[in-house]
């Protein structure tokens, strides 16, 4: 998406690597929710000197971070994609609490590899950890609680995007976030179909890219 927005609008885009991500699972085990917010703030500070306005665009947990951090940092607008309001069913709170006493990781259990993806070629190029660190799930729960408290404080324009075919973070999560944005100056929601959770890489990605482009362009002109 960053490459698309740069090509279409000439925007400077930064893909923030959150603490514990894209390295090794044991690095994720050591990460806390405050490390993730610090990663966002670091990225914001890198862009601040090079941009007139900054937008947050976040996928999944990145969407929750975008909502929360928009109340702490000066941004022009936010785009959330497949953002959770509650913990995915794969990580019920009781399971996290119980297993945390004697396990470090939980296996990924939702079907065979590629389940939920519509573009199988895109899935082949998708890289993720093979295990779910239990501590990270507990930290995500804390982050979501913080996001809930922050929703009424979000005042910037927000575009919420979710796939109706997302079986990991169910579509009703977007509705609950939308309802919670009681003070956003502009809020829009978009449902797409024919994609799973990672809509920025799955079959509906072009529609998602164009929606984000049009939203940012519109807000920039106001």
Name the predicted role of every residue range.
Residues 188, 193-222:
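Catalytic active-site module of serine/aspartate enzymes centered on a nucleophile-bearing elbow/loop
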Residues 12-15, 175, 179-198:
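Catalytic histidine neighborhood in serine/cysteine hydrolases
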Residues 58-62, 66:
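Gly/Ala-rich beta-loop-alpha elbow adjacent to hydrolase catalytic centers
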Residues 79-90:
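Active-site nucleophile loop of the alpha/beta-hydrolase fold
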Residues 1, 156, 170-179:
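Short alpha-helix in the alpha/beta-hydrolase fold that links the catalytic acid
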Residues 24-50, 55:
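Catalytic nucleophile-loop/oxyanion-hole region of alpha/beta-hydrolase
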Residues 154, 160-162, 166:
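Short beta-strand/loop motif that positions the catalytic acidic residue
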Residues 6-25:
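Conserved alpha/beta-hydrolase
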């Amino acid at each position: 998406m960053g490459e698309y927005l740069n090509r279409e609008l000439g925007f400077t885009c930064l893909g923030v690597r959150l603490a514990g991500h894209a390295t090794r699972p044991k690095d994720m085990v050591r990460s806390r929710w405050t490390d993730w917010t610090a990663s966002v703030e670091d990225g914001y500070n890198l862009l601040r000197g090079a941009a007139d306005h900054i937008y947050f665009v976040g996928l999944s947990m990145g969407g929750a971070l975008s909502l929360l951090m928009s109340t702490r940092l000066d941004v022009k607008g936010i785009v959330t994609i497949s953002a959770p309001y509650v913990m995915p069913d794969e990580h019920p709170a009781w399971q996290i609490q119980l297993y945390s006493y004697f396990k470090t990781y939980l296996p990924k259990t939702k079907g065979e590899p590629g389940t939920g993806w519509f573009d199988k070629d895109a899935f082949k190029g998708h890289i993720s950890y093979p295990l779910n660190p239990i501590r990270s799930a507990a930290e995500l729960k804390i982050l979501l609680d913080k996001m809930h408290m922050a929703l009424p404080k979000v005042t910037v324009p927000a575009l919420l995007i979710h796939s109706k075919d997302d079986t990991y973070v169910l579509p009703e999560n977007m509705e609950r976030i939308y309802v919670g944005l009681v003070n956003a100056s502009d809020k829009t929601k978009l449902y797409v179909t024919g994609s799973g959770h990672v809509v920025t890489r799955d079959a509906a990605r072009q529609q998602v890219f164009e929606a984000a482009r049009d939203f940012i362009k519109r807000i920039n002109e106001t």
